[in-house]
């Protein structure tokens, strides 16, 4: 079975209650795009997930 790396881009923001929250802003399969997003500011980051290549297929 093939696996795919999925990168969830996130950023920190201040919520309505004044607390700092992490917000998902995009999803990409490109590691370089994820690293570029992270390098744009200290508030940016990404999480990496490995998912089966056939995750959408019926079982």
Residues covered by each model-derived region:
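Short, mixed-charge low-complexity intrinsically disordered segments
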Residues: 39-59
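Short aromatic-glycine-(Arg/Gly/Cys) micro-motifs in beta-strand/loop hairpins
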Residues: 1-24, 50
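Short amphipathic alpha-helices within nucleic acid-binding modules
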Residues: 34-38
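Conserved aromatic
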Residues: 28-31
